From Swiss-Prot:
It is a multi-pass membrane protein. Disulfide bonds join C15-C36, C27-C69, C50-C86, C177-C247. The gene is vipr1. It is found in: Cell membrane. GO terms for molecular function: G protein-coupled peptide receptor activity; peptide hormone binding; vasoactive intestinal polypeptide receptor activity. Residues 129-135, 203-216, 281-305, 358-447 are cytoplasmic. This is Vasoactive intestinal polypeptide receptor. This is a receptor for VIP. The activity of this receptor is mediated by G proteins which activate adenylyl cyclase.
């Protein structure tokens, strides 16, 4: 909304500068709140195109406005007639409001689901040390980029709706509003760059013979977070010095500065499609190679399935709409770009975490361990080495096989088979004594 107000103010200022020196015996050039009219002689009929800012209200704004210069001045036009001539549909306002409200609800739900699923995925990967590896670190950075994207959407909506309600801010174009848009654009670009990092990592894993994951990891961080920083800073400086209009949230097809953001994203998608083809070719060769073990081949296949699915899934919609003007197929663009795009974070979490075999196995292992500790007591440990003050060293190993359903446990008919082995070795001077005890009773502390 601020961009529309500022664009109207800019058109008014240009009109006043253009018509300031015009002297005529007929009608003087002027700005009539809607459009700029040139000077004309009495009896002259003037036809001008609809102002360019009507493109914000309608896809069909290429109409004309007309006035006649009379002895009493310009003929008056009803503002509603002007709106109709310039393609503004008065009957469609309610339907448009309902559509935009539905779109906002749709992408709010999508980003909320993505935010919850991505946060859960990060917690799962962080809690288990067995899942700490370069591959999952890259996944977590990708998760964080989509989390920041969802947060940026919520913050942007809150700020822009406040700006619409307070039209006084439109004249000043607050720095906070622009900062939110800059952060929003950064998060979008970062999500594409980290998807590119996923493709680069998988390609390096398959193609490089001696692949140092730790060495390459810092380069991946530089690409994923540093690359968007450079381009977004360049775009921000360009907007601030050459096109500082409104809150920077309106994207015009004629805005050349917008390509500072579009070009890197398109380049990352193009690189991912090239990697897509190369990975398929290398993967086919490795799977068919007899020197590659079955387990290693399955590992390549599982990682490739997720990455190769995400590359076309996230790239096609951006490429389709990148070269289409913003005012064409607005409804279709909003549905694909906002609603479907808002669920991308959820898809990432499902493919890289929830459907990951290693993650599922680790969750099952922790669940069984928690279930066993809950049955035996909170102080029970699988292995508990202790060192006494007299030099005794004990190692206790507990193995329990439990076959007990909840119903039988409540009926107190649970049968447990417990095998307890206590291995103790005591050293006194030059003598050694070994003792092995087996039983079916509770383990007590040995001192």
């Amino acid at each position: 909304m601020c961009d529309v107000v500022n664009e109207i103010e800019l058109a008014r200022a240009r009109c006043e500068n253009k018509t300031a020196g015009n002297v005529t015996s007929g009608c003087k050039g002027m700005w009539d709140i809607i459009a700029c009219w040139p000077s004309a002689k009495v009896g002259e009929h003037v036809v001008i195109p609809c102002p360019n800012y009507f493109r914000h209200f309608s896809d069909h704004h290429e109409g004309n406005l007309s006035k006649t210069c009379t002895a009493d001045g310009w003929t008056e036009m009803d503002p509603m007639e002007i709106a109709v001539y310039c393609g503004y549909n008065l009957n469609g306002t309610v339907d448009d409001d309902s559509f935009f409200r539905s779109v906002k609800i749709g992408y709010t739900i999508g980003h909320s689901v993505s935010l919850i699923s991505l946060t859960t995925a990060i917690v799962i990967l962080c809690m288990s040390r067995k899942l700490h590896c370069t591959r999952n670190y890259i996944h977590m950075h990708l998760f964080v980029s989509f989390i920041l994207k969802a947060i940026a959407v919520f913050v942007k909506d809150a700020v822009l709706y406040d700006v619409i309600q307070e039209s006084d801010n439109c004249s000043t174009a607050s720095v906070g509003c622009k900062a939110v848009i800059v952060f929003f654009q950064y998060c979008i670009m970062a999500s594409f760059f980290w998807l590119l990092v996923e493709g680069l990592y998988l390609h390096a894993l398959l193609a490089v013979s001696f692949f140092s994951e730790r060495k390459y990891f810092w380069w991946y961080i530089l690409i994923g977070w540093g690359g968007p920083t450079i381009f977004i800073m360049a775009w921000s400086f360009a907007k601030a010095y050459f096109n500082d209009v409104g809150c920077w949230d309106i994207i015009e097809n004629s805005d050349l500065f917008w390509w500072i953001i579009k070009t890197p994203i398109l380049a990352s998608i193009l690189m991912n499609f090239i990697l897509f083809i190369c990975i398929i070719r290398i993967l086919r060769q490795k799977i068919n190679c007899p020197d590659i073990g079955r387990n290693e081949s399955n590992q390549y296949s599982r990682l490739a399935k997720s990455t190769l699915l995400l590359i076309p899934l996230f790239g096609i919609n951006f490429i389709i709409f990148a070269f289409i003007p913003e005012n064409i197929k607005t409804e279709l663009r909003l549905v694909f770009d906002l609603i479907l795009g808002s669920f991308q974070g959820f898809v990432v979490a499902v493919l890289y975490c929830f459907l990951n075999g290693e993650v599922q196995a680790e969750i099952k292992r922790k669940w069984r361990r928690w279930h066993l500790e809950r049955f035996l007591g909170p102080d029970t440990k699988y292995q508990h080495p202790s060192m006494g003050s007299n030099g005794n060293n004990f190692s206790t190993q507990i193995s329990m096989l439990t076959r007990c359903s909840p119903k039988t446990r409540r009926a107190s008919t649970c049968q447990d088979e417990t095998s307890i082995t206590v291995l103790g070795s005591t050293t006194m001077g030059y003598g050694h004594q070994n003792e092995t005890v087996k039983g079916h009773e509770d383990v007590r502390e040995v001192s």
